[in-house]
């Protein structure tokens, strides 16, 4: 009875030695072929032949324009990425047998996804928002609202929020408060404002007076010319009639008019004198 368990143990160990269990897993950087672990090909190389009991795995280098970037058992290499200029792409870094080509977008554009297969325009931050992070070839613009004390009045992919103007540092007073879209408006202090406004008003009044004086001087010239015209010229323009040289004298005689004839002396009788 004691020998039976010993016999079972003996035959079990013998069968295990003759018929070993097939492998189901291999070490890192190995792959399983027909229950045998073969070494993988390194990056930049592809598989040509699997290993045998006494022969190691056969690999060969990827051709130009191809690559494999990991340890592998691939029989074909991958083609390098093509950076299509029609999509706004250009080569940022040339590919090798171990790495793929890196594409990036032209200026003002960024990739639409992680693979950078196409490009799109950078976003603009509208008024009230400033640029927190400038866009790159692989990322879009990041905008941030302008906090209190700052403003942005343009749409831009570069401009950050600007601080409000400090009126006090300029010796001015605040006329209008700022917002996230507009700057503070400054103005002169009341006393300074008067010193500025009064000379301006005086200057305007002086100009008005000078203009008025010039206008009056121009208007008076023709009037003076008429008032002091040469009398000889008037006579030439308007000659006197011939009978007006020696007008007929008239006297009264007994309340009756007496006409003095031309060429005779005028005499009055004694009675008339009395």
From Swiss-Prot:
Record's bilayer topology term: Single-pass type I membrane protein
Cysteines paired by S-S bonds: 26-37, 38-51, 41-59, 62-77, 83-103, 105-119, 111-116, 125-143
Cited PROSITE patterns: TNFR_NGFR_1, TNFR_NGFR_2
Residues modified by glycosylation: 153, 180
Each TNFR-Cys repeat, start to end: 25-60, 61-103, 104-144, 145-187
Pfam families with a match to the protein in the record: TNFR_c6
Transmembrane segment boundaries: 195-215
Keyword Transmembrane helix in record: yes
Secretion signal, residue range per the UniProt entry: 1-20
GO cellular component: CD40 receptor complex; external side of plasma membrane
Domain of life (superkingdom): Eukaryota
Single GO MF annotation: signaling receptor activity
Ranges per topology, Extracellular: 21-194
Location in or out of the cell: Membrane
Quaternary data: Monomer and homodimer. Interacts with TRAF1, TRAF2, TRAF3, TRAF5 and TRAF6. Interacts with TRAF6 and MAP3K8; the interaction is required for ERK activation.
Name of the molecule in the record: Tumor necrosis factor receptor superfamily member 5
Lineage: Eukaryota, Metazoa, Chordata, Craniata, Vertebrata
Gene name as annotated: CD40
